[in-house]
Regions:
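Alpha-helical transmembrane segments and their helix-start/interface "positive-inside/aromatic belt" motifs
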Residues: 1-5, 73-80
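Perimembrane loop-to-helix junctions flanking transmembrane segments
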Residues: 23-43
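N-terminal signal-anchor transmembrane alpha helix
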Residues: 1-18
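Hydrophobic residues within the alpha-helical transmembrane core of Major Facilitator Superfamily
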Residues: 9-10, 66, 91
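Alpha-helical transmembrane segments of multi-pass integral membrane proteins
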Residues: 90-147
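Hydrophobic alpha-helical transmembrane segments
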Residues: 49-65
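Transmembrane alpha-helical segments of multi-pass membrane proteins
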Residues: 77-91
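Juxtamembrane helix-break-helix junctions at the cytosolic face
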Residues: 63-76
Length: 147
């Protein structure tokens, strides 16, 4: 879970996409919170805010889950919620990438950056943590039956 928190936090600070302008100009970079235009200006985009909120809540829930190690059922339910939020982030990103949800601040062809893969990596890490917590819960139940 700690790796999932770190990966989510890194995803907040690195660009998730780039937009090559249709005419002449430099590429604009898309972050989870907004767009850095080719001229160096920062535009907080209403289109990108859901990406920021989803990834931030995912990181916070993953961090909270670490400290709930004594309550495995709550841990598993928070892991499920975290995975749902990460899937929602991926869907929102794909909709932006395909142009179904346009970014009004810049126009052009959108490309994928490396940081767009980080929430997917985090999703895999949370799924692995969920499996580990579930296995621990089964082990504890089996030990209780033996007594």
């Amino acid at each position: 879970m700690l790796l999932a928190v770190i990966v989510c936090a890194l995803g907040l600070f690195f660009p998730i996409g780039s937009i090559a302008p249709e005419g002449m100009g430099t590429d604009s970079m898309i972050y989870n919170l907004g767009v850095v235009t080719g001229e160096g200006g920062l535009a907080i985009s209403a289109t990108c805010i859901p990406l920021f909120v989803l990834l931030s809540v995912t990181a916070i829930l993953s961090l909270v889950t670490i400290f709930l190690y004594k309550n495995r059922k709550v841990q598993m339910s928070i892991c499920k919620c975290t995975m749902l939020l990460q899937v929602m982030w991926v869907i929102d990103y794909v909709l932006i990438l395909l142009g179904i949800i346009p970014i009004p601040e810049v126009q052009g062809k959108m490309g994928i950056e490396f940081a767009a893969c980080l929430p997917i990596v985090s999703l895999i890490l949370v799924a692995m943590a969920y499996k580990g917590v579930n296995d621990d819960e089964k082990l504890v139940k089996a030990a209780d039956r033996i007594r």
